[in-house]
Every structure is written in C-alpha cells, then in structure tokens.
C-alpha cells in the first residue's frame, strides 16, 4: 500500500492501524537545533484524542507520544524523527459481526476489492485513528513555523448540520474561547445549539456532518510552485486526505460562483490589500495575507441505525455498526486540519528558502 507519505523537503510518513499495537510516524526534513520534547507535541494530541467529552467517541486513549529518534539533549539533530503512540483501548470483539459484511459508506468494500484482504477491526488503516500521527508531526511543524517565522496556524468549527457559527473576522476571533469549549467554537450561542443537536443525535443513534475553518496568519509572500505544486493545490490535497473530508474551499471557495469580478478581485493600495476573497493565495503563490481554508466533513456511517449492504459473497445483508464512534467527526478534526496545513506550509517554506533566498 503506497500513499503513506506527504511532502518533499518536510516529509511525513505514518503507519499503524486502529486496533494494532501502535501508531507511528517518521518525520524527515526537520531543521537542526529546534528545541523539542514530547511536551511540545502532547497538547495538540490531547485536543484530538477520543474520550475527552460526551460529544465524541467514548473510546479512551491516552495518546501519549514517545519520540524515538532525531532529538539529542533536547534539540533536533536534523535526522529523521521517529514517534510512536501505543494503542490501549481496543475492543476488537465489537467488530466481529462485520468481519464478512461491508459497512455502507465505509472503506470496507473498496479495501477488500483492491487488496483482497482488510483489517475489519475499527476500520484498520482507514480509521481516523491514524490521524493522531499527523497531529504529532503537525505539532512539530507548528512549533517551527511559530518560532522561526511567527506563523500561527489555528482552526475552529464553523458549522454542524444546519447550525452555523456567526461570521467571524480574523482579528476578532477569541482563540482562547475556541480552545475552552469541546466544539472548538468561537460563538457561544452556537455552542449551546451544537450541544442540543449532538445530544439529539446520540439518542437517535445517528450522525451529522460539519464544516471547519483553518487560518494561517503571518505567512510571507512567495510560497507555492507553479504550476502543479501550487500552494492552494497542495493544501487541498493535504486537507482532502483527512478522513471524511468531502470538500475543500480556499478563501471564498464556491461562493465565487455568485460573485462578480469587480467584487471578487482583491484590490490593492499602498497600504496593502483591501479584501481577501482569494484566501491569501494568488496564482498558486501566497500573497502575504492570511491563508484561509474551509473543509466539509461527511456524517460518519458508523451508526446504530440498521443499513442495507452486502457480504463477501455478494448477498444482501443488514448491517448495524457496534463499537464506539463519534456522532460528528468534525469536532475532533480541528487539530487534524491545523496539522495538515502546518505540514504543507513548512514544506513550502523550506522549498522557498532553498530556491529563492
């Protein structure tokens, strides 16, 4: 199975399955002499890990990361950084009923058809549990971006189902508030509505989709490589690679369909840009404005409501998903999306420094 690596100069490779012994990753390209320890990585993992609130899966994992290599006397050496997280709360017996059945809406069918074998326990490699290592790698990228370039990468949940967060102006977002509630939401009124909606869904045994926004501030001009390695193209690739993501928007995204050129173009004055409809990227290259990306995540198919499907023999069957699952996967996706944006930005920054300055 290929496709486990992202990046060119800053490269991240992950491995492991949902119910395997452990998850791990190799991070190549981290510049030397960056002060780094598990304490720099753990906070983002704690934001993503399961079992932290009543709104997410009850599976409880400590998600304690261990650095295996690439750090000496508290600083990166420039060699590959190896990290691992051990799994501890697997209940593989919950998945015995779907060993020979395909859960509708999941990767069960496609993995079986492609490889002729699949790890049915919790989805195996296709499980969002794999993203823990992306978050670990992303924490390193975020630290380097922050300390060496002053770049901040942060995200918030902007919609669950029909409940939308009030429009946010970047400079007015209260990031402490975002990180103080289980929904990563800057709008207190929306938090209450999110709570009601998730409680209702849990009673019904159903799930719901979500939308979240990621913002990178203080990104310099010049990141991105025409024509196939455009910064927005690489961001879209990275964000689409997150489990359950079905759509990515940069800047105004699909709203540009209804805009006119006189409205959409980001006009400039000697003092700078007057708007940011493009989301901080022009011609595939960063413009110096905040980079804004929005992603849409589908409702998880792991629900207790019976669904029609087939088994390995192609026979019609009914599937009821057991186990422990998130009623809305978008809630824990905020730190994952931040990580993917940070990984792409650091990769492009290193490429920019190698080529241009």
UniProtKB/Swiss-Prot annotation:
Superkingdom, taxonomy of origin: Bacteria
Binding site for NADP(+): 48, 54
Single annotated GO MF: chorismate synthase activity
Cofactors, names only: FMNH2
Catalyzed reactions per annotation: 5-O-(1-carboxyvinyl)-3-phosphoshikimate = chorismate + phosphate
Biological process per Gene Ontology, one example term: aromatic amino acid family biosynthetic process
Its EC number(s): 4.2.3.5
Functional pathway: Metabolic intermediate biosynthesis; chorismate biosynthesis; chorismate from D-erythrose 4-phosphate and phosphoenolpyruvate: step 7/7
InterPro entries linked: Chorismate_synth (IPR000453), Chorismate_synth_AroC_sf (IPR035904), Chorismate_synthase_CS (IPR020541)
Key word Magnesium present: no
SUPFAM superfamilies registered for this protein in UniProt: Chorismate synthase, AroC
Biased composition range(s): Basic and acidic residues: 38-49
Pfam families: Chorismate_synt
EC class (word): lyase
Binding site for FMN: 125-127, 243-244, 283, 298-302, 324
Keywords of the record: Amino-acid biosynthesis, Aromatic amino acid biosynthesis, FAD, Flavoprotein, FMN, Lyase, NADP
The family this protein is said to belong to: Belongs to the chorismate synthase family.
Name of the protein this chain belongs to: Chorismate synthase
Organism, as annotated: Haemophilus influenzae (strain PittGG)
């Amino acid at each position: 199975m290929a496709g486990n690596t992202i990046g060119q100069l800053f490269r991240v490779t992950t491995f492991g399955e949902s119910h395997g012994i452990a998850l791990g990753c190799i991070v190549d390209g981290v510049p030397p002499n960056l002060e780094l320890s598990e304490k720099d990585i753990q906070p983002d993992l704690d934001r993503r890990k399961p079992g932290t609130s009543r709104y997410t899966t009850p599976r409880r994992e400590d998600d304690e990361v261990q650095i295996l290599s690439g750090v000496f006397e508290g600083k990166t050496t420039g060699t590959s950084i190896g990290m691992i997280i051990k799994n501890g709360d697997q209940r593989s017996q919950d998945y015995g009923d779907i060993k020979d059945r395909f859960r509708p809406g999941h990767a069960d069918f496609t993995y079986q058809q492609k490889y002729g074998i699949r790890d049915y326990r919790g989805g195996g490699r296709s499980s969002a549990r794999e993203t823990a290592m992306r978050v670990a790698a992303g924490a390193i990228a975020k630290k380097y971006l922050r300390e060496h370039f002053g770049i901040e990468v942060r995200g918030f949940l902007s919609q669950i189902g029909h409940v939308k967060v009030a429009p946010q102006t970047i400079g007015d977002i209260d990031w402490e508030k975002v990180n103080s509630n289980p929904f990563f939401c800057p709008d207190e009124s929306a938090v209450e509505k999110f709570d009601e909606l998730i409680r209702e869904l849990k009673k019904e045994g159903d799930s719901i989709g979500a939308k979240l926004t990621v913002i990178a501030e203080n990104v310099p001009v010049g990141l991105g490589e025409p024509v196939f390695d455009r910064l927005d193209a690489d961001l879209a690739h990275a964000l689409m690679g997150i489990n359950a993501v079905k759509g990515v928007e940069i800047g105004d995204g699909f709203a540009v369909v209804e805009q006119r050129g006189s409205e959409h173009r980001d006009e400039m004055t000697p003092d700078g840009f007057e708007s940011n409809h493009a989301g901080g990227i022009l011609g595939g290259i960063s413009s110096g404005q905040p980079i804004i990306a929005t992603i849409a995540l589908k409702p998880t198919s792991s629900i207790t409501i019976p669904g029609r499907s087939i088994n390995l023999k192609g026979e019609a069957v009914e599937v009821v998903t057991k186990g422990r699952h998130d009623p809305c996967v978008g809630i824990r996706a905020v730190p994952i999306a931040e990580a993917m944006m940070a990984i792409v930005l650091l990769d492009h920054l290193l490429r920019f420094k190698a080529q241009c300055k």
